[in-house]
Amino acid sequence: MEERKIIHIDMDAFFAAVEQRDNPELRSKPVAVGFDGPRGVVSTASYEARKWGVHSAQSIAQAKQRCPDLIIVPCRHSYYAEISHQIHQIFQEYTDFIEPISIDEAFLDVTHNKKGIELAVDIAKEIKVRIKEATGLTASAGISYCKFLAKVASDYRKPDGICTIHPDKALDFIAQLPVEDFWGVGKKTLQKMHFMGIYNGADLRKVSEEHLVEVFGKAGHIFYHFARGIDERPVITYRERKSVGCEQTFLEDIYAKSAVIIELYHTVLELLERIAKSGFEGRTLTLKVKFSDFTQITRSISQEKILTKKDDILPLAKRLLQLVNYSSSRPIRLLGLSVSNATSEEARKEDKENSTLKPEYRELELEFEEWKE
């Protein structure tokens, strides 16, 4: 069987880099992109800011404590999306097998590329140069035979780096790889692994698949295979939008039922506006709630009828809210709503593609969508 050639391209501090490119006064200075308010959150931090411990999803208040000279720049999502589109047009010159993971990163399967270039590393080098010429921005690239290792490789020499993990070197590389760098290992999973004495790939490889499944559920299968350099997930070209959603962080935490219902109503109205603009049709409504301690939960409900009207969405949103325990000791910081489970023909084709994956790998893809938030 022919060895695959997978590239993972990840833009370096994308939002912050765009702002530094456009404003020379911001260059070489600690910059964070986000809303500069009492409830603001860092979307992206420049590398100068990261040296001070500033990172994405951190509150602006905490970021300023760590870096008093931090410069906050408002987020321009539509502008960043335009630049992202430019970058994806470059990808399309080399392959049609492109899987966007977010606005600033994507997988490319270049096993059979359009330009007939033999080495994936040469393609990655060309793409990096093309991105720099077209946008003035840098990207990091990881190359390997599977998505797991390609993504790990792209992080290995950031910023503006390139790293290849060859099949014959993969097991040695994984053996020394800290488990926190494994795809799917979050804080809670990391704590469990450390409690079990698992600190790197070599440690993980010593644990039986049965025991990993016993502790981590279906993810245990994934960790078992990753530790052995096995990742069969294909690069899937997403033709159809997966969901439409919106969320709001409140200026003050809320817990009174009346206040929460009012904010939920406003969130429903915003969601309806986005659905109308996008033309998206879905059957699953998901409620996202983030509490004052930054923990968050999601609750979902599906039905046969498409969700495009207030009379359909609002009652479902209220039902989902009833499943959430909030109080004065556990107030709500953020509410979000999204509609997914697309009804279009393209989405059904995509579902068929996904159905070829093993169940545990399909679950990983779904979980990764949540990790991005």
Name these PLM-found stretches.
Residues 1-215, 220-221, 345-347, 352-373:
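Gly/Gly-Pro- and Ser/Thr-rich, intrinsically disordered tail segments characteristic of DNA damage-repair
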Residues 8, 181, 189-334, 339-372:
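DNA-contacting surface of Y-family translesion DNA polymerases
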